Structure formats: structure tokens, C-alpha cells
């Protein structure tokens, strides 16, 4: 069905535009590697519910903003930041990679942890 009213002005209902362009690849800022001990970032200890045991347990709480490349947090633990909280299960460890990301690994995966710290993974 269509209708043409020659006396009426043209009205555009929808317009879609797609643009493609090239940009320079961003240079990502990396941190210097520090000792694995995260104790300077520890805020407190708090009772936290542990899903594996279905019980509350007192675990260390770390300030995620104070953690740096190379820090290693053994589970169970909590990492808190302004916008998120990360639970590290007792079956996992967490490391901070060179870009500041928190990477969780099953305990015993030392080769993967070291590969991540060296930037190979």
C-alpha cells in the first residue's frame, strides 16, 4: 500500500549513517612490577559468606586502588574498589597484571601466573 500526496511537503522519518575511519592504536600505560606482597593494600578483615563452605569466614579486605602490577592476593579474600568488589575464592589466587587488571587463577597454576606477569599470556 502506498499513498502519494503531491501537495504535501516531504517528511523524512528515519535516517541511518555509518562512518568508518582509521585511528592510531592507543599506547597503553603499564605499571612497574612490584613485590608480590599486597600487605600495604590490606584495609581490614571482615566476615564474608563463602559459597563453597556455605558459611561465613573472616577474610582480608584489600583496597584495589592500592594494588599494583605483581601483587598477588591468595584466596579467600575480597578486593574493593569504588565501582566494584571482587571475591577471590579459596580455590583461586588473584594477581594484578601490567595493565592493572585483576586476573584470577586456580591455585597451583604457577606457570600461567608467571606467564601473565611476564606478558606472555
Predicted features, each with a name:
Residues 1-121:
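C-terminal, non-catalytic interaction/recognition modules in large multi-subunit enzymes and RNPs
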Amino acid at each position: 500500500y502506498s499513498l502519494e500526496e503531491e501537495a504535501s511537503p516531504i517528511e523524512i522519518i528515519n535516517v541511518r549513517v555509518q562512518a568508518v575511519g582509521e585511528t592510531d592504536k592507543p599506547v597503553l600505560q603499564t605499571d612497574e612490577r612490584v613485590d608480590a606482597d599486597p600487605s600495604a593494600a590490606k584495609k581490614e578483615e571482615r566476615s564474608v559468606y563463602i559459597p563453597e563452605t556455605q558459611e561465613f569466614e573472616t577474610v582480608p579486605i584489600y583496597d584495589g586502588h592500592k594494588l599494583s602490577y605483581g601483587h598477588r592476593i591468595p584466596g579467600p579474600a575480597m578486593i574493593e574498589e569504588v565501582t566494584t568488589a571482587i571475591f577471590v575464592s579459596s580455590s583461586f589466587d588473584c594477581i594484578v597484571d601490567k595493565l592493572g587488571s585483576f586476573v584470577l587463577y586456580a591455585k597451583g597454576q604457577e606457570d600461567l601466573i608467571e606467564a601473565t606477569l611476564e606478558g606472555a599470556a
